[in-house]
Amino acid sequence: MDTKKKYLVTGGAGFIGSNIAKTLEAQGHEVTVMDDFSKNGHFKNLIGFKGDVIAADCFKFMPRDMYFDAIFHEAAITDTTVMDQKAMMEQNVEAFKNVLAFAAENEVKKVIYASSAATYGNGPVPNVETQPTHPENVYGFSKVIMDNVARQFAEDNNDMTIIGLRYFNVYGPGEYFKGKMASMVFQLYNQMREGKRPRVFKFGEQQRDFVYVKDIVKINLCALNNGKETGVYNAATGIPRDYNAIIACLNKEMGLNLEPEYIDNPYPFFQLKTQADMTAAKEKLGYTPDYTLEAGIADYVKVLDAHYGRK
């Protein structure tokens, strides 16, 4: 029996999309990447990829008459500081509608898409998928609307399963081209490899649910293989860690002993803590994370050191 499947990954030259695409290909599947290479997508994220690449924006274009066993929709504006509401809604919501319409027209039965923890805003933690959404920016709002669109589309097309994954604070290989939106792990690593003291807001005690990108790939595959019904699920570890812990891990893995430099926080509404409730993802998708913060940073530093030629 042939177990080889065909998958489409939109935003497949970006951080998370490229990791999904290369993992699926390594498992022996036929993978097509779609990316317009205008935002976070970069060809270097696809070095070694053997599949097809469609250079297009799914807000403006979707291929015709192509069948896929499933679609992973990762294409989006991910910069949470973008204030252009029209552009955000077009690139995130309207493009998603195009992907769903394409899936329905071509009888694709499963779509897995990137939602976000930004849908929760400053809601009570740990965040549960059923709690009210309170987005603090247009990015988070666009993801709330995507979740609404997915739910309604699945009701109208009951032979489709549409699963949203609310990514928390993701870090790992492939984020080099995200610029200011790269993770704090990546930014602190770069400060420290230059011999600078790592700079964090006073006093480094703000907590985030940091999740390694390999675990994000894992939950996408769990959604593919185990997800039976439409819905949204948290994609995280469920264990919040503070910035001081990141610095300690980096010092250990880089063989350094740099003290943090604590700076004033200019943001009056800066979140003190993010944390996901992972019960639903475990029960419905069979997902449990493989990487603690220590294990994730240890793995990541090896990749970063090789990338920068650091010994």
Per-region residue spans from a language model:
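N-terminal Rossmann-like NAD(P)+-binding domain of SDR-like oxidoreductases, especially those catalyzing
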Residues: 1-166
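Short, solvent-exposed loop/turn segments at secondary-structure boundaries
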Residues: 83-87, 138, 175-180, 272
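Short-chain dehydrogenase/reductase
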Residues: 89, 136-144, 179-186, 209-210, ...
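Structural element of the ATP-grasp superfamily
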Residues: 99, 150, 188, 281-282
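Short glycine/proline- and charge-enriched loop/turn segments
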Residues: 126-133, 171, 262-263, 278-280
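NAD(P)-dependent short-chain dehydrogenase/reductase
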Residues: 148-208, 213-218, 222, 248-251
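C-terminal substrate-binding subdomain of Rossmann-fold SDR/epimerase-dehydratase oxidoreductases
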Residues: 193-311
